[in-house]
Amino acid sequence: MVPIYTRGGDVLVGPVYVAGASDMPCLGCLEYQLTNFDSHAGLAVSRAAAGARIGASHGLDIREARDLLVDVVFRSGGDRSGGRAVVGTLSGECVGVGNLTISPLCRLGGHVATCVGVEGPRAAGGDADLLVPGLRGGRFASAQSRRDMIAMSCDSLFGPVVGPRRFESISPGVLSGSVVPPVKNAGWGRKRTSLDADFVGVLEALERMSSLPYHDDAVVRQIDGDERCLGPADLGGYHEDQYTHSSSRISADAPEEWVAGWGMDGARVWVPAEIGFYSYFPEYGIADMASVFDAERTPLRRYEESSSGSATGATYGEACTHALLEVVERHAFMSFWYSSVLLPRIPSEVLSGFAREVEQWISNRGHEVSLLLLSSPYPIISVACVSFNARGEYPAVILSAASGLGFDAVCETALWEMTNMVGGERTLSESEARARLISKWDVMEAEDHIAFWALPERAPFIRAKCRGSLLSEGEVEKLRGRRGAGSRLDALSALSYLISEFPSHDLGAPVFVDQTNVTIGALGVSCVKCIVPGALGVSFGFAHQRVAELRVLERLGRSDLLASTDDLLPHPFP
């Protein structure tokens, strides 16, 4: 429900968020609440529905409420594509306009206190215990708590999540998506029950909504020379031909902008803005929809970053933990990709019953599966799943990956991730892929990475990387026995435990950027982006693969990639 608040003769349209101990009215700052009605459900229907719901809930005349929305909101003269919120009067007079972003945050002067910001170091140690190997606390352990979270997050008209979108079951279990205008689907949930699939999909949608800074002040142009920051030597840089190629969407001349992250020691570490918030475009600031709708946008970014390392959690520490696991998963996969060392394969006979069921489902659709045990810091287990089309047809190869502390759960997740790609629709047909991807430089988006390696003639290259020896049953049992399911760790201990072996893998101490915005905070969850110095990154586009200056490539026997792009290939997208 969207309340109407009156302040003298002024009217505010928007939800209530909690700021500290008091309830503060604000405009919500979800762009689609007001400016995307027409793109979501049809303008006429949405206006009437909004008026009816507001009038019914606040005792206002329905016509009066509808006129307020039509005359004040939709005729305010604001630029819809950039997002506008309105302060008006019941007579329809517009007395103030404020920007909206999908962050979201309150952009009207009197309500900035509702913004959720990080004013100092965030300590994970105060969080509730996390269960190992799942590394989740108890807040959402019950089915009712998950139902309540879905109910709080979803509203068919005003969001923040419009609602779950159930997909026809194309594999064992249930697949749900979460609809967030203006995109068709912003979060995927794949679980064994509808409730759990909806819940995971909603959490992922909230995670994606946190990909922009929560207020302008979060981004700074200058930092003190004595302060810690991460640059190309920590994150990877580009070769000159990557900067200059026509397929590049980055620029060495882009402004250097920074956001604050926090190390395990509580110290502030500055991170490039496009790394800390992967949807951030410097030329548009926090007006994210403006960048989406501007087809002529200029490439003023220094990084073309994926969402790797972003996670939501019931607490800040829980979010940090799962963000870290995703970085390790992607780094382990990329290490496998760049290295020429063969990794051990996991035999089907040792898999759990559910994993074998999923594997059989994939096999029934004409694909052969190889599960590889990736090299990752103890105690984390990372697995890659490689699916080969038995007929040698397009898509000839599909890849996925997963990581965690439980061997069976990690294998199940890696296989499960594969099912949607094996059974779902192709983003690009084979003819479209061939016409679009003439050379490696033509790989520019996530679907290009996938399609490039799905072409049949490239299958032998990947098959050659999947010929390692099979793990023995004894080796698998050691992996299963690393930690008992009943063990408990507080979040700080869990993070310390997970990173204890990082130095031996040429990985630095993680840095955490708190992406929690006002909506996420009001729902009582946190969103975090984790950055690990030295980790191999997953990027969108061959020209944006950051390999220069990453010394981990020397350990992998790929010093040639530090010198030039001659032997560099587009990475698959796990």
Predicted segment positions?
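Helix-biased "structured C-terminal domain" signature
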Residues: 81-574
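Oxidoreductase and adenylate-handling cofactor-binding alpha/beta cores
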Residues: 66-79
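A structural signal for alpha-helix termini and helix-coil/disorder junctions
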Residues: 32, 75-76, 330
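E1/E1-like adenylate-forming module used to activate ubiquitin-like modifiers
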Residues: 1-68, 104-110
